[in-house]
Amino acid sequence: MMKHMFWFCSATLALLAAAPARAQAVPNPGERVESLITFGAQSDKQWGDDDFAQTFFFLIPERQRTPVYIRVWDPDCGGKNDDLKGAANTTTSFSLYGGPGTFSGPQARDPRPTNPVPTGRLLKSQTFGSEPQYDGKWYTFGPLNPLEGEPVDEFKGRVFKLVARGLTGNDGNLYRYFFSTSPTENVSVEGGNAFTYEYCFRLPATASKTTVHLYPFVNDKVVSIKQSNYDVDNAATLSVFSIAKNGQPGTMSGDGEWTSSVFPIANKEHGLSLDFRLTSTKPAPNDLVFYVTDQYDTALPFFAIPLGGRPRYQYDIGVKIHR
C-alpha cells in the first residue's frame, strides 16, 4: 500500500539541527504522552489498538562506536500500570531487529502492513506475561554493537527496530522505552533519536484539560499530508502548528472508527517537524492510534525529538515605509 521514498538532504540537515537534544525517552517528556500501549491479540479493537502491534526505530549516529542499550519500562502485563480487563491473561513479545532490511525492507515502515512478519535480522525476542519482578521495573536489550544496525544514509546513522506484539489475552500493556548507553541507568545516546510510523498511545486522564504533542517530520518532497486516527472517541481535538500553520484544525474519530483529514504543505515547512496538538478534557484515559502519509500515500515518521526543533509559527509582519 505504501510506497517508500528517500528524504534526501532535508532530513539530514534537520537531524543535525536536532543533534544537541539528549533525552531519548520514548515517549519523550516534551510529547506529554502518558505511555505506549499494546493490547493482547484477543482484545476488542474498540479499546484503542487497531492491530495489537507497535514498531519503533532507534537511530544511532554514524560516529557512535560504543555499545548501546534499549531499555523497556514495565514490559510485563498484569501490574498496577496496565489496563486489565479482569484477571491478567496477556502475553507481549518485544522483538529486536538489526541488519539489512530492518528499515529498508518491504513494508518495514508501513503503518498498516499486509504482511505482519517484521523485516531485518532478529537479534533477540523476549516474551512477558504477568511477572511482578518487571512491574514498574526496567528490562534491557543489549549490549548492541552499533554496527549491527542497518545503515540509513539519509539519517547519517544506523537503525535498530523494536516490535512489541500482543500475543494472547485481552489486557492493555502500558510501557515505555529509553535509548541508553548504560544497561542499568537511563543515559542518553548523544545525537540519537527514536521514531515510529504508527503511534498507539494513551492520552492521560485529566480533571480539566491536557494537551499532548506529536511531531511528524516533513521531507522536501511533500506537497500535502493526510493525518489518520483511530478510536479517539470524539474525546479530543486536533490543532496543527508549524512555521506556516497556527492551529489548523483536523478531524478526529469516534469510537472504533478511522477518520482522516488533509493539509497542504508550504515550501517553508520542508525539512521541519509539525506539531500535532491533541487536547482532551476527558476524565478517563483514552487509547488511540495515529499515522500520517504524504500525497503518495507514503508514511511519515513521528520523532521523539522533533527534527529541526519544536515548530513555532512564523508571523508575517508587513512593514510600510513612509517617505
Locations of regions flagged by a protein language model:
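C-terminal edge strands of extracellular/lumenal beta-sandwich accessory domains
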Residues: 24-31, 56, 84-103, 134-252, ...
